[in-house]
Design a protein with these regions (language model features):
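Bacterial N-terminal signal peptides that target proteins for export
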Residues: 1-9
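Soluble non-cytosolic domains of exported or imported proteins
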Residues: 31, 35, 52, 56, ...
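Periplasmic OmpA-like peptidoglycan-binding domain that tethers envelope proteins to the cell wall
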Residues: 142-216
Length: 223
């Protein structure tokens, strides 16, 4: 395949995802993301979540038949999460699951101590994560743009760390969990009004296949 053919392949596959891939299920989209990769798909996914989360989704994708197998496994996990996490936004993209908890669900305003209701939600999530141990969990903290850049960065780090610490205390293996604080750098809405700022104050979880799941999927796919 030459450079021009690759260019149009990426554009075409990007268009499929952008229009919702009406003839494709979510597992088949996993194969598409892996094949197309890169900027075209990333731009589409990035409209639904922060760029950091979108990058994690793309970076974890292996595509092809193995990617479709992983996608089916993620479909099952996402369905279970949707049943018990009514206060979270759960998105299936490619071979990954992205969970978005708004600030008010987990923390008080400008706080990094988990609320009682947050602990209840995280307990439910931890039960599912333990049931499916062959995934990695990336926890990403975000703030709005009010306050100084340094303050917001530190707050986002503390919030991501608080969530990670709680999941570990709920017996989710520490080796599966990583955290990052993005501060105000990765908004999903405008910071010019209260509604937009509330959307930007969030914690995202990106759940991806670990190496064991990927190798098993490749073997099952005959790759």
């Amino acid at each position: 395949m030459n450079a021009i053919q690759r260019y149009f392949l990426v554009l075409s596959l990007g268009a499929l995802v952008a229009t919702g891939c009406k003839t494709m299920n979510r597992s088949q989209k996993g194969a598409v993301v892996g094949v197309a990769g890169g900027a075209a798909i990333g731009a589409v996914i990035g409209k639904k979540m922060g760029n950091t989360a979108a990058g994690a989704v793309i970076g974890a994708a292996i595509g092809g038949a193995a990617g479709s197998i992983i996608g089916k496994k993620m479909d099952k996990q996402a369905e279970e999460m949707e049943k018990v996490l009514g206060d979270a936004e759960i998105t299936r993209e490619g071979e990954s699951i992205v969970i978005n908890f708004k600030e008010k669900v987990l923390f008080g305003y400008d706080q990094s101590v988990l609320s009682n209701s947050a602990q209840t939600s995280l307990d439910k999530l931890a039960d599912i994560l333990e049931k499916y141990p062959d995934t990695d969990i990336r926890i990403i903290g975000h703030t709005d743009s009010k306050g100084s850049i340094r303050y917001n960065q530190n707050l986002s780090v503390r919030r991501a760390s608080a969530v990670a610490t709680y999941l570990r205390s709920a017996d989710v293996a520490s080796s599966r969990i990583s955290t990052i604080g993005m501060g105000e750098k990765d908004p999903v809405a405008t910071n010019d009004n209260d509604e937009g700022r509330a959307m930007n104050r969030r914690v995202e979880f990106v759940i991806t296949a670990n190496e064991k799941m990927k190798e098993e999927a490749k073997r099952d796919a005959g790759e």
